[in-house]
């Protein structure tokens, strides 16, 4: 059913492009990919998006116009927000902005993740932090921390839309069975991702290499906080 609807949309788009091509002058732009905030509804999992709320009149009208032409967006409502209290403050965007951009991610155990982006890859380092000051039995503790980190790493990869090569530096473990269980856990967590992930292997130094397909630009490159929001 979903594929049928998608095919209808593509057929309509093709017919519209052919109609424009017959009457358009030379070097006329016939089609331009819609901005990210318009196509977001298709990229999210089913039922993940019920409403789009915006305080931009221009974006609101653009969304309304586009969604009228595409029946796949019928169940998504578009609302224009007119209150004097900004959406930025109402939904605590600063907090989520920091979570999506921050280099350091603190775990409940007291350990932390350090996420760094380079041109070649993304490197994620797992640090024990102050945990060792509280507990003993390092082997068991390191395994527990690595499990907690693996779950959060998979979540952060989805949240930040990190793609390409990803290197994860887990805390050193000696037990081979624990390493296998950790890899399996990471693979299972990555299966929650609608974008294809491939956990390659773990080296003797507890470095895990994985890849994630690139569907669109990472969140780091997408979000731009305007000066008006920053002042608020």
Where are these regions (language model features)?
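Conserved glycine-centered short motifs in functionally critical loops
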Residues: 10, 109-232
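OB-fold/S1-family RNA-binding modules
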Residues: 1-113, 118, 204-206, 211-214, ...
């Amino acid at each position: 059913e979903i594929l049928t609807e998608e095919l209808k949309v593509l057929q309509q788009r093709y017919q519209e492009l052919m109609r424009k091509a017959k009457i358009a002058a030379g070097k006329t732009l016939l089609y331009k990919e819609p901005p990210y905030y318009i196509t977001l509804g298709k990229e999210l999992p089913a039922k993940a998006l019920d409403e789009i709320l915006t305080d931009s009149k221009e974006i609101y009208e653009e969304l309304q116009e586009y969604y009228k032409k595409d029946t796949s967006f019928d169940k998504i409502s578009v609302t224009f927000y007119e209150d004097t209290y900004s959406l930025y403050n109402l939904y605590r965007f600063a907090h989520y902005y920091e979570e999506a951009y921050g280099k350091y991610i603190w775990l409940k155990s007291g350990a932390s993740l350090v996420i760094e982006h380079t041109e070649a890859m993304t490197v994620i380092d797992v640090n024990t932090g102050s945990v060792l000051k509280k507990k003993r039995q390092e082997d068991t503790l390191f395994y527990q921390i690595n499990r907690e980190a693996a779950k959060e790493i998979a979540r952060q990869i989805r949240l930040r839309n990190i793609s390409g090569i990803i290197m994860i530096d887990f805390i050193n473990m000696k037990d081979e069975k624990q390493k296998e269980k950790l890899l399996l856990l990471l693979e299972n967590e990555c299966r929650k991702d609608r974008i294809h992930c491939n956990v390659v292997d773990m080296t003797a130094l507890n470095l895990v290499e994985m890849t994630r397909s690139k569907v669109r630009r990472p969140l780091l490159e997408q979000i731009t906080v305007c000066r008006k929001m920053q002042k608020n």
